């Protein structure tokens, strides 16, 4: 059994400061997406929830420390992790009128079904705002036009997408689609 924590007069080490900053950055990034991650990130094992698994993944793989501050590595960040076949050639493009054009190849084979649903995650880092588009289209549609809120006009957003099986809990691992300026 552990004893009660005690106040210390020792200054934290650089390593401790780095770990605290990384943890804070990951928590600021993931907390608003908690409800999504709790349904889409990997398979819970033992006492670890999906959200805990996502936090552990991001602390190890998707956060950087430059010696003064921690930052999220968006190209390594994940919002889902699973065995479903990912959409092929998934791409996002800004379209005038606060719209986001999503395109992909219908690759319905293996465990991928034409009825699989596309989920899109849009993150605006300056204000730390999220927009989630659940069931945006089916795999067979191969395209979707999403309307973003007006407050994102002119902002650079980070975008991810993944598929969810309509009839089972299977998810594909999310794909980072890049930084896009909303027009």
Could you tell me what each predicted segment is?
Residues 1-3, 98-104, 146:
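Generic recognition of long tandem-repeat/solenoid scaffolds
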Residues 1-88:
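Long, polar/Ser/Thr-enriched low-complexity segments
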Residues 63-113, 137, 173-183:
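Pro/Thr/Ser/Gly-rich low-complexity, intrinsically disordered linker/stalk tracts
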Residues 126-135:
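Surface-exposed loop/edge segments in extracytoplasmic proteins
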Residues 137-143:
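Short, solvent-exposed loop/turn segments in extracellular or other extracytoplasmic domains
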